[in-house]
Amino acid sequence: MSEKHPGPLVVEGKLTDAERMKVDSNYLRGTIAEDLNDGLTGGFKGDNFLLIRFHGMYQQDDRDIRAERAEQKLEPRHAMLLRCRLPGGVITTKQWQAIDKFAHDNTIYGSIRLTNRQTFQFHGILKKNVKPVHQMLHSVGLDALATANDMNRNVLCTSNPYESELHAEAYEWAKKISEHLLPRTRAYAEIWLDQEKVATTDVEPILGQTYLPRKFKTTVVIPPQNDIDLHANDMNFVAIAENGKLVGFNLLVGGGLSIEHGNKKTYARTASEFGYIPLEHTLAVAEAVVTTQRDWGNRTDRKNAKTKYTLERVGVETFKAEVERRAGITFEPIRAYEFTGRGDRIGWVKGIDNKWHLTLFIENGRILDYPGRPLKTGLLEIAKIHKGEFRITANQNLIIAGVPESQKAKIEKLAREHTLMDGVKPQRENSMACVSFPTCPLAMAEAERFLPSFTDKVEAVLAKHGIPDEHIVMRVTGCPNGCGRALLAELGLVGKAPGRYNVHLGGNRSGTRIPRMYRENITEPEILDSLDELVGRWAKEREAGEGFGDFTVRAGIIRPVLDPARDFWE
């Protein structure tokens, strides 16, 4: 439909202030280095507040005590969130031990937060510890460059322990894509690692002086698992194998979930199929997609700046043709692929070379020593003896990967002793939330702190209707920016106000359909009342193997979203 009325390739008009900031920043330096030495405030001032995002950090404060501090005439309790760049979520046990120590010694909350972007975050880093965290990461071969703001963010890769050989190849491509699309500015090394300034002019051959119009997310996905939720991402490489070997990728472009409440110019969108490419064209095509979005993306309105809106404005075929022109290739027809699920298989799975992989369920990805549940200590003890690696999944879980038969019993014993293998029901395994309160400045309603007890109540509803071992893919996100990926869930809750959510129904288990808003601005008891009725019908009327989301569509409870740019809000 979008091909019939293509819009302008470049949106004319007054540029946003973010564009001015990027030009003025001297390739992302700003005055961050000077600001670090200002002890009068715990935060970063002016442009630096936003510029630190390009260096992988967000300035936050503890919203639980914001009003109390204001009464005391104190500034908010500023602290930084730092997000590591970790393509494919792979981290060595040596690196894990370093981040465990930093979290314990130098953050307010003492936790490691696994995210659905397949990396980890530190919350609560005081300004005095900001430079040390970057130096600690560098000392173990990690960094936080380009994990936030208008760049290609952390590249995801299916954490598939079944296809170990294919995973190894796909993971290498995730790393290559991440490295290829990194900014070239030396600002990160100069500010955080004390590297000397070089008397040359910075050049950004791919990203340009003003970087991208908005955040940009990339995945490498191995069917039939859609664990990385490709339709939440701008650019997706779907692995195509022949005889167990990776031969190329299907490219899908223009997914994204972020919306604004009540703004009908915003919508969630699934990614569009562009075609198949052999492996040798991967980096050229990745660069071509990014530079096309760089040049054509809307820099006059950040709420309309993501790749999904560019595709709808110029037309999918026009965008695709430009990618072909820039990359010097012609897309081949899409090769057959299918997604059957996206959850992690909790427990032991045998891979190649007689190595085992243990997937541990980590509720909400929050790793901390709780009373009677010493999760953080348990993982540290495993890291001390495990010779393989850890893999963070896009479902916020953790895989102890590459365990030899001789170590299996020892690692399982440690996991069990530290409550890391306490069994949970399928509903809890298939539920996810973003961080939200108390640290996220955008939060409108609780998410991470709300989900565990809400899941208890959903489990009770399933049990009441005789299906205690069933599950609904359930996501809670504290605001419509959508970090919790609620707009690809069978049941998605989007925070509207404290204690109130918009309820979306009609996604599916494989994550290929956007759910539609079913009820607006309702409370937890109202959500559970609705769910009681809907689950009762699902239990009685469903067809064999029919998931909750598919049932709500087939039964006419909700209309499917078929063309989001036009029917998402209907």
From Swiss-Prot:
Cofactor(s) demanded: siroheme; [4Fe-4S] cluster
Cofactor binding, per record: Binds 1 siroheme per subunit. Binds 1 [4Fe-4S] cluster per subunit.
Binding site for [4Fe-4S] cluster: 434, 440, 479, 483
Pathway listed: Sulfur metabolism; hydrogen sulfide biosynthesis; hydrogen sulfide from sulfite (NADPH route): step 1/1
Function noted in UniProt: Component of the sulfite reductase complex that catalyzes the 6-electron reduction of sulfite to sulfide. This is one of several activities required for the biosynthesis of L-cysteine from sulfate.
The family this protein is said to belong to: Belongs to the nitrite and sulfite reductase 4Fe-4S domain family.
Name this polypeptide is given: Sulfite reductase [NADPH] hemoprotein beta-component
